[in-house]
From Swiss-Prot:
PANTHER family: CHAPERONE PROTEIN DNAJ (PTHR43096:SF48), DNAJ HOMOLOG 1, MITOCHONDRIAL-RELATED (PTHR43096). Residues 6-70 form the J domain. Belongs to the DnaJ family. Keywords: Chaperone, Cytoplasm, DNA replication, Metal-binding, Repeat, Stress response, Zinc, Zinc-finger. Its main location: cytoplasm. This is Chaperone protein DnaJ. The J domain is necessary and sufficient to stimulate DnaK ATPase activity. Zinc center 1 plays an important role in the autonomous, DnaK-independent chaperone activity of DnaJ. Zinc center 2 is essential for interaction with DnaK and for DnaJ activity.
Amino acid sequence: MAANRDYYDVLGVSRDASDAEISKAYRKLAKKYHPDLNHEAGAEEKYKEVNEAYEVLHDPQKRQQYDQFGQAGMNGQGGFGGQYGGQGFGGADFGDFGDIFSSFFGGARQQVDPTAPQRGADLDYTMTIDFMDAIKGKTSEISYSRSTTCEVCKGSGAEKGTHPITCDKCGGSGMMTITQRSVLGMIQRQTTCDKCAGSGVIIQHPCHNCHGKGVKTQKQTLQVKVPAGIDNGQQIRLAGQGEAGKNGGPYGDLYIVFRVRPSKDFTRRGQTIYTTVPISFAQATLGDEINVKTVYGDTKLKIPAGTQPNQKFTLKEKGVPSLRGGSTGDQVTTVEIVIPKSINEAQRKALLEFVKASGGSIAPQEKGFFERLKEKLS
C-alpha cells in the first residue's frame, strides 16, 4: 500500500471510530473488493489495502502504535500485506468460500448435542376411498413400511451387554472445528466429524440384529378409522405411527391424506350433496311424488304442480355430516324435465286438445309443438 495512504481513509471511518464501526466497514469493503467477487482492474490491490488497514486498526495495540507513530510505528508488521504478500492468492483455498464467509460474518452453525433424544420423522400415506365411505365413514386396514426401534439393542446400535463410547476425535459433539488460513486471515469453521459421522459416539460392537443402526425397517399394519364426512384432500394424523426416534426420542407421526373417488349419482361441495332427477312434462305440470336417491337411501320428494325446468328442492339433513359432529348438511336436488323424442297418435291428439284448451293453435307450417316446447323450457 502506498506509504502516504491513511488506514482510516482506506476503511472510510473517522479516527475515533469504535471497534464495531471498523469491523462493519471492513466487512463491507472485503466483500466488495474480494477477487472472487470483483474482477475489475485494481480490485485485488484495493482488497489488499483493506485487509492491511483492518489488520492494524482492529488490534488495540497496533492501533495505538499507528495513532502515535503512523506507519513508522508498524516496523513492517502492517498486517496483511507483509504476511501474505509473498504468497499472493494462489495458495488460498476458495473451495469452501461459502463456508468461510458464513463463519467470518456471523453465520456459524448452532451446536446441537448429537446424543440428545431426537424425534422421529413424520410419514405420509395416501388412502383412496369410495364416495359413500367418505360420507358415512368406515374402518380400513393399511400397510406401510417404517423404521422401528431395534428390540435387541433398544436403539443404541450396540450389541447386548456393550455400550457406545464417546468419539475421541470430536469429544462427542459430532462436529470438528477446523482452523485454516484464507485470504481473510485465520478463520475457523465447523464440519461433521469424519470418524463418528456426526453421531458423537463410536460403536465398537455393532448389534447383530440392526447392524449398528439402532432401527430396523418393518412392515406396519394398522386399522384406520375413516371419519364420516372426510373430504377429498383432507388428512388425519395418527400420533406415534411415523419413523422411530433416535437416542430414545419419540416416534414421528403418520399423516393419512384421503383421495375420494367420484360418484356417478352425487356431487359434493362442503357439507352439501347435489343430484339431478328427471321428470316428465306431465309430472311437472300436474305435480307428483317421486323417489329420489340420497346417500342414506331413497326418499320421497313431492313435485308441486307447475314445477319449472331446473327447479331446485332441498332435502334437509340428507347431506354430509360435520367432522366435528352435531350437524348434517342438506341435499339439493334439481329436476330436469324430459321431453319425449317421439309420441304415438293418441298422445299427439291429447296434446293438441291441451293446446286448444289453452287457447293456442299449432299451424302445420310452424315448428313442431315439441320443438317449440323444448325452446320454451330451455
